[in-house]
Amino acid sequence: MAAGPAGIVWQTPANPPERQDYIFRDGRRYVRPYYFEFISHVKNRWAGKTIVDLFTDEFKGRPREYYVHAVKCGRLQVDDQMVHADYVVQSSQKISHFLHRHEPPVLGGDITILQNEADVVTVCKPASVPVHPCGQYRKNTVVGILQAEHGLVPLFPVHRLDRLVSGLLIFAKNADKAESFRQQIEASLLQKEYVAKVVGVFPDGEQTVNANVHFNAREGRSTAEVCDGDGKAPIGKQACTKFQRICTDGIHSIVLCKPVTGRTHQIRVHLKHIGYPIANDEVYLSENFSPRSSKGTRINRATTLACSLPSSDPDSCADLGNNDTNEDTEADEEFSIDPMCTNCPNLAPVGYDADEEALWLHCVRYTGPDWSYECPYPDWAFLDNVSRKKLKS
């Protein structure tokens, strides 16, 4: 635990997740909000800014008013010391941000352990759960949940799955085994297989898509790029995916997907490219998708909401963040409310998209030179009894 403003126990990345950290409600897994010390070091481009200007410019999830109060109350410190709002930071200084951390909820399904060997553990990852700590997620991750519920630590992810993708995940239990897997991946010795539920009747026979994948981080999605005949090489990275229809009911098809390369959103964008997008993929189903740059990222929407909070007395350290929302406030009985928190009294952080669902894309198999790991098919892959027999045969 970290030393911070008096009277509060502050967690750091060194504090492991525990089983009692989770709250289950309405089919979702929440993390009980907790006090946390975020530590960063002043980058060269930050040097010369005041502490308040720095956080206002770089961390837009909270309004400037919050950061002014945070400095005054010791929630923002430099080199473990309280400073004033006009303090100018210098390169490499340590900055601690003590805050009440709310993680986004994930779908409430269990993480099923498939195989637990001496050097390897494989699991079935539910959709919506990130593999490892990133962004707002720390405890609500596959790594965090496995540590809290099964005591599995350390774990080294052999591969990644996007947050909304479900299915097989392989972890090495030690650095040597992780390095062995890494070498096999670099030598292109692994075969990956996914299933997807797509719109329409997918063609019979193997379909191979060779189209560069260009990921636009600003828009939050990829595009498939091919040569348009003008002699210019297409942008993006070379990508190849092989597809095979497993079954169809005339409305949807279940398709086996074998990515030869591993680009961001490769399977999703290649399926869209050939006219058979994943049937519930909001990002690639429509050409009218509202990109991040036009509708605002989740963090920008959070900023807008936070800035609309009732203004507080500038001399008070206790009134900021008493946001009144429609979310069920029975959470008050399950965690402490922080008067400076811009998310309280809600369990989820401001701006969380409560409507997201599992993507119909699921990893079913990874095969190496002398090993193979598999994961059961999801319920959505069984279109009828015929498809159930095919998939289970």
Curated annotation (Swiss-Prot):
GO molecular function: pseudouridine synthase activity; RNA binding
Xref: Pfam families: PseudoU_synth_2
Disulfide bonds: none
CDD domains membership: PseudoU_synth_ScRIB2
Domain S4 RNA-binding residues, every copy: 49-118
InterPro entries: PsdUridine_synth_cat_dom_sf, PsdUridine_synth_RluA-like_CS, PsdUridine_synth_RluC/D, PsdUridine_synth_RsuA/RluA, RluA_PseudoU_synthase
SUPFAM superfamilies: Pseudouridine synthase
Protein name from the UniProt record: RNA pseudouridine synthase 7
Enzyme class: isomerase
